[in-house]
Amino acid sequence: EYEYNNSNYILLGAIIEKVSGKDYFTFIKENILDKAGMTNSGYFASETTNTVSPLVRSEKGDSWIEVERGKGKGSSAGGSYSNVNDILKFSNALKNNLIVSKETLKNMISVKNNNMIVTEDYGYGFIIQKFAQELSYGHGGTAKGVNFEFRYFPNSDITFVIFSNQDNGAYDDLKRNTTKLITGER
């Protein structure tokens, strides 16, 4: 039975450290962020500045409350920050084989969970979905006060990125309607 679990990403981070001989954050900076030109991305630390705070609605729903971030640096399972321009650079780096080979990307976006979920499949690190018969791959993430989605449509060569510092609100509608615009779905 397929079920998404962040602990697999913690294990992947440990494997990266063992195989590369580098700590996870250094490896990601050198092999993804730097190669893709992602200068506004990284992992939270106490000195991180110029980021937007996550927000949640009060219990009464009449105000917004800032969510306090954890004190740690993050991990291979989360705790990173970025912006739209850097995620577009990431998408372009994938397409142009700057961070993985064409063969590796093909392997990453091939279905690994044998179609066990009706609406999506899973590859290596990517959720694979079809919208109106158009293939897409990407990944999202949520945490208290945060929503994120990155999706690439290879047939139309369109990438869309959503960042939200809220864990409710217009995120789902924005994601759904943007996908409809890209695919022509009604």
Where would I find each of the regions flagged by the language model?
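Short, gly/Ser/Thr-rich active-site loops of penicillin-recognizing serine hydrolases
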Residues: 167-186
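Short, glycine/serine-rich, charged loops/turns that create anion-binding
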Residues: 94, 166-167
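Short, well-ordered beta-strand elements
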Residues: 138-139, 149-152, 156-166
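Short, small/polar residue-rich loop motifs at catalytic or cofactor-binding pockets
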Residues: 145-146
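Glycine-centered structural positions embedded in regular secondary structure
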Residues: 125, 141, 159, 174-175, ...
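Short, surface-exposed loop or secondary-structure junction motifs
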Residues: 1-142
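Short acidic, gly/pro-rich beta-turn/loop elements at beta-sheet edges
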Residues: 118, 136, 160-162, 170-172
